């Protein structure tokens, strides 16, 4: 996959066009201010004592700004279909000559999601200068078990002169997650002098050996900037998995916002009660006719600001720290008028006299159109950028109770 690697490492354009730039607002809450306030000496970003890759913050910035012009014809439609971006920082890595072995904990990858794209991102100078490299990928859980997932060979020094090398591991990861098979593949550049059968034989040996017994120089993640070796996974929640609550729903207890009962009580039509004298009297008005009072919609959208820090979720939500979710509010007038967003049934019911109904109900003023929002947060020791549906009220209208 042809990429402008330097561009992707420094200014990643918006891949998820379904994510609208809905976070408006305060200068103190801008993504730029977060990057500035949380910078550390090694280039990583600090959040609640945890380091997270600058790439994820830059990706989030570009998503909410709607930048997508520089995406290639291949990445644009693929990334547009994703609703989750998950980053995995390497737990450790080993090198023996030009043979690199990387260890990731990918326990949090859900098999119920459809994998769209998996990128391995390198920004180590020693890797960029290598002429011919074989890279092995392992899954490890707390360092106790090491499971070989696949391998690829490449020639970093022959690629574009970029500070960050990006490799497409989509097939490798898909093959392992869906079939449990290891994959040895040339993703980008053929390395001269290496044969596929030799790699397959080596991979078979790797699947059964204990990597710790090899005489290798092992470096841990604490010895270098967190984002220098990272696996980024783009995924889409499948339709059959929609019945399960999303990750945000599993973490949060949804708040219920009710409408004031006093505002919803209906007294019915005002009926003019005239006595016998009033029926026989004729009133003549000499003044100008009174203008008909404009009937305004009774169901409207009002502000509802959510501060994640105040409700106890600030410890794991990186951005946004706060946003306007809006809510619907009404005074429930009958009969309904044509300016109010209601069903035909609501219109008819509002016109019936009180005597014809056992109970006069007020149509509920509820959201009829919702907007999505992108969120960057910490989950299962990984940083995730996820697109959550129905987070912001866009339009309100009447519906039957």
Swiss-Prot record:
Tissue note: Expressed in the dorsal marginal region of late blastula, becoming restricted to the dorsal blastopore lip (Spemann organizer) at the early gastrula stage.
Q: Which UniProt keywords apply?
A: Cleavage on pair of basic residues, Developmental protein, Disulfide bond, Gastrulation, Glycoprotein, Growth factor, Secreted, Signal
Superkingdom of this protein's organism: Eukaryota
Q: Where is the signal peptide?
A: 1-18
Q: Domain note for this entry?
A: The propeptide region is both necessary and sufficient for bmp-inhibitory activity. The propeptide region and the N- and C-terminal thirds of the mature protein are necessary for neural induction activity. Although cleavage doesn't appear essential for activity, residues surrounding the cleavage site are necessary for activity.
Subunit info here reads: Monomer. The propeptide region interacts with bmp4 in a non-covalent manner.
Its annotated function is as follows:
Exhibits mesoderm-dorsalizing activity and neural-inducing activity, but lacks mesoderm-inducing activity. Regulates the expression of specific mesodermal and neural genes. Induces convergent extension movements at the embryonic midline by activating the fgf signaling pathway to induce t/bra expression in the organizer region. Acts with wnt11 to induce Spemann organizer cells and induce axis formation. The unprocessed protein antagonizes bmp-signaling.
Question: What name does the UniProt record give this protein?
Answer: Nodal homolog 3-B
Task: Please tell me the species this chain comes from.
Answer: Xenopus laevis
- Give the gene that encodes this protein: nodal3-b
